[in-house]
Amino acid sequence: RRTTFSYSEFFSKLIDGEVYFKLENQQFTGSFKARGALNKILTLNESGKSISSVISASTGNHGAAVAYAARQAKIECNIYIPEGSSKAKMSNMKNYGATINIFGSDCVEAEAKAREVSEKNQVPYVSPYNDFHIVAGQGTMGAEIKSQANELDAIIISIGGGGLMAGTASFLRSVWPNIKVIGCSPSNSAIMIHSMEAGKIL
């Protein structure tokens, strides 16, 4: 779904420049995650193999997006989540048709279990970030921005696993080589920064 690219008068005055927001809350399931999930499920369906279900791990937005994409493709969806996950987000995933499996005390353990079950049962695992088709799907946001704006000086992108940053920045750098790309990572979940410092995916 194409989302609004909205000028912010308040923030533009605050920095004495022009600030725009890409309103991905308007996207299917309420976040940009639907872009990658839909692209991934679409490519699975076009692979020539008979796909009847997918597996993923998530605490919220990605799980809802995968469940939505799976429902559109009329296939089953199993999501692994850790204990103590938000009941509201769990309910949201269920509403989109996901079967919820609670495992482990954190996202790392839930993801490891999901990958284990995926491999054992030969069911495709849909990664939230470490997948070319997910990244390419997220990159459609960059293509939309290009069609909605004149050349930008800079773009600020939130970073979790890095899928949105990788996809969007790759596209925008290809059409606007001089654009400055800035990633923002939450201080209480700076896994991308730690991974970059370690030189490997943590």
Regions found by a protein language model. Name each.
Residues R1-L202:
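PLP-dependent amino-acid enzyme catalytic core
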